[in-house]
Amino acid sequence: MSVTLAFPSKGRLKENTLAVLEKAGYKVVLPDDDRNYRARVEGEDDLDILFLSASEIARKLGYGSVDLGVTGEDLVRETLAHADERVAIEAQLGFGHADVVVAVPEVWRDVTTMADLDDVAADFRQRHGRRLRIATKYWRLTQQFFSQKHGIQVYRIVESLGATEGAPAAGSADMIVDITSTGSTLRANRLKVLEDGIILRSQACLVSARRSHTSRRVEEIAARIRAGLEI
């Protein structure tokens, strides 16, 4: 029975993933045609490799249509409802670091914490006749963090289709929840991260589908990759 692995299809995530596999002793033989998104592992005929977008990898792991994959923890938590019941994070891989954060305009000088934001949200409707608008691509993580963790209920999520950090300046939102590596883009757009506004510290992870946990082969591959990370 073959094991299906899904890895990022391009860029530094792909390069770093292949380097992790090589350290674990898995040599991936790439196709000659760049439009071919399948590959094989030298000497491992039962391994089938797919190259997909990081978000598609998270979805397929949730469905159980791939056994192991490399993707960002932020995508796993955002894409999958009840993620821990559907997938398991086997290892953090040490690259692709980024934080999902709550950021507000710098001119909101009195707003530095989520408690301050709760006060603003409650007051916002009375002052402006509408709810506080939050631009984000991370609606699930935003709802969990605001409503469940901090008890903030009076807000509205505005779907972000472009550059989220530009939404407050454009007038389409009052604040944002977005992912950042260095914070430089937020600062360039005169936004600040709240002191307790880090929702998730994300990085690339090796993730397994829960429905594949009966497979010894999947466990063996995950263990070998973890061992390679310690070299």
Swiss-Prot record:
Keywords: Amino-acid biosynthesis, ATP-binding, Cytoplasm, Glycosyltransferase, Histidine biosynthesis, Nucleotide-binding, Transferase. It catalyses: 1-(5-phospho-beta-D-ribosyl)-ATP + diphosphate = 5-phospho-alpha-D-ribose 1-diphosphate + ATP. InterPro entries: ATP_PRibTrfase_cat, ATP_PRibTrfase_CS, ATP_PRibTrfase_HisG, ATP_PRibTrfase_HisG_short. Its EC number is 2.4.2.17. The keyword Transmembrane helix does not apply. GO terms for cellular component: cytoplasm. It holds the Pfam family HisG. Catalyzes the condensation of ATP and 5-phosphoribose 1-diphosphate to form N'-(5'-phosphoribosyl)-ATP (PR-ATP). Has a crucial role in the pathway because the rate of histidine biosynthesis seems to be controlled primarily by regulation of HisG enzymatic activity. Lacks the C-terminal regulatory region which is replaced by HisZ. Belongs to the ATP phosphoribosyltransferase family. Short subfamily. NCBIfam families: hisG (TIGR00070). This is ATP phosphoribosyltransferase. It comes from Brucella melitensis biotype 1 (strain ATCC 23456 / CCUG 17765 / NCTC 10094 / 16M).
